[in-house]
């Protein structure tokens, strides 16, 4: 069965209604955020959440020198062997965002780097493709000037410096975590790492594709998991619920903006809902909620047809993913934030920006305590742009991806999915809903909104690990 067509119709959340001030370059018309549509009452002034998912960067890789944040330009490496092994400091190298390196960031490399919480063995990770040692390559941080839009959002709005990804693994499971908070397929096993597919990961994968699992006793079972489609999971995936199930039950509108999947590609991530059989197999469900290309989010903001909940998965060239040699990710994020800020959606919206996994790069803060699902993983950055966050707020609260899921559930008074959302601290403490909605401040960027609206899709997978 081929991938279903992407979204044509658009549904709305309720809206609030004051125009934001300020003139962004390529400012969009203020969409009619009060247009009638399906709506479910919210617990906060927020009636729209946009979750932007960038790729493969630790917190320290992007914010090593951000004032007031828990970052560093010095790491630790383990040298020597046996009794001669010793921990020594190593200066992190400042690099370009468009660097060509793509490092190993699967579960085994996470365990090596973690080294029982000492965070000193990133230099012992080996490339997954060649088996050669990566050496000092993980010990880097990006030149702040090249991620200035991220720093501006953090300065004008809010940054979290202790958000840990759900598992110490790669993008396949990380994107599942961002729609449901975990990858448990039964009471003792969770998915981890990548499927063995030679095409897009999910229900479109070729027959015989396997996933990998980790047990609650932390036994890693490589290539012993089910086909990456929920109808092949234990109990036909009946317990593998996502936020989409909660939204549909409560009549909350949602869309997942992502590159269109292709049937002819190497094993790769395109869309987290390709794994979710009830969404993938239902033509009307897919066409209503899955929207391609990602720039459709800009169009929906302009047209006043933004749903209550949006996930935004970028084109590979706009994702910050190492190896694609592109510097466009920060501008892509800024273009969406600026579009919201120039529209009537601003006073009712929270834009949350996260990086899905650690990408194999150094980070100094050990996740603790470890759980029974191969996590928590290493720190990744989280930005929040909203009229209800104080300027230049840095949250040092320990969060996980379940914290974002929990905040989404709280916003629309939804029940818990029963994954990591249950034990995680909600990100609601980053907001001050008693303050008057702040006027929007434009985020300057190298590439304007018009660039992305005219950008030719790369046709590349968002991630292959």
Where in the sequence are the language-model features?
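C-terminal motif of bacterial Sec signal peptides marking the signal peptidase cleavage site
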Residues: 17-20
